[in-house]
């Protein structure tokens, strides 16, 4: 029995991988569309076999929490995982001494247990990459102090809605964070989702002025105007 997962649809990646030598293949994941059954508990919570990917040995990947209360129209997380952020694992489930941790949680700071989970990350002394956008609106001096105890490789936030001015939230984080390099304070900037070029440029320039490294994300890239694709290339390179 083989479980075959897929993250993206044909817009971004073709489903070209063929599974051989298996009596049964169960396909799932967002790349195959909404819905689908949850994985059995023992599969969901099995420790990843990192030896399948030798070039990534030394790095642990996993979720401590799932779900997000924001229910953004461009994002599938709330519909797929629920509109509450809940703890789903302890760090020991997918980390056993690796030097680096890639954390995949969609909205860790919205989880009621986030302080304890940050404590687990800090105690690991591993280098942590918060790969998904932490919710800048949920940062405060207390949880920023907890984040400061974590050996952080990079922290990612997001400024998706141009109608929402997040400037003061980003200022507060910079004032309290121990992350000194702007290259390690990264912000996803969503474009081609109802925003104008002027609004996109404003967010990029504001973030740079505040000491962040913006990263332009294009919604449905094939439909994006040329100026947006040029902006992405200019900012991300």
Feature locations, PLM:
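Glycine-rich beta-alpha loop elements in corrinoid/cobalamin-binding modules
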Residues: 1-59
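Short catalytic/ligand-binding loop motif for oxyanion handling, primarily in non-cytosolic enzymes
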Residues: 10-13, 33-37, 70-71, 81-83, ...
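Generic structural signal for well-ordered alpha-helices
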Residues: 13-22, 118-119, 144-147, 167-177, ...
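A short helix->loop->beta-strand "cap" motif at the edges of active sites that frequently abuts
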Residues: 20-25, 181-183, 212
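N-terminal pre-triad scaffold of radical SAM enzymes
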Residues: 48-85, 98-105
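Flexible glycine/acidic-rich beta-alpha junction loops that bind and position SAM and/or redox cofactors
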Residues: 112, 192-197, 215-237
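Catalytic cores of alpha/beta
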Residues: 193-210
């Amino acid at each position: 029995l083989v479980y075959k997962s897929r993250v993206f649809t044909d817009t971004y990646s073709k489903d070209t991988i063929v599974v051989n030598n298996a009596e049964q293949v169960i396909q799932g994941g967002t790349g195959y569309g909404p819905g689908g059954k949850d994985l059995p508990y023992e599969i969901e919570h099995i420790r990843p076999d990192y030896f399948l990917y030798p070039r990534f040995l030394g790095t642990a990947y996993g979720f401590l929490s799932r779900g997000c209360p924001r229910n953004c129209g461009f994002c599938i997380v709330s519909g797929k995982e629920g509109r509450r952020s809940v703890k789903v694992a302890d760090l020991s489930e997918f980390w056993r001494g690796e030097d680096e941790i890639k954390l995949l949680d969609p909205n860790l700071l919205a989880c009621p247990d986030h302080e304890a989970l940050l404590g687990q990350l800090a105690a690991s002394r591993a280098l942590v990459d918060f790969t998904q956008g932490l919710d800048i609106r949920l940062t405060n001096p207390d949880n920023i102090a907890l984040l400061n105890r974590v050996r952080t490789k990079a922290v990612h936030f997001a400024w998706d809605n141009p109608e929402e001015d997040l400037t003061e939230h980003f200022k507060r984080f910079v004032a309290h964070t121990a992350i000194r390099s702007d290259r390690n304070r990264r912000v996803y900037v969503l474009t081609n989702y109802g925003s104008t070029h002027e609004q996109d440029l404003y967010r990029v320039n504001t973030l740079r002025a505040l000491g962040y490294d913006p990263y332009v994300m294009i919604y449905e890239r094939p439909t994006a105007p040329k100026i947006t694709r040029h902006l992405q290339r200019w900012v991300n390179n």
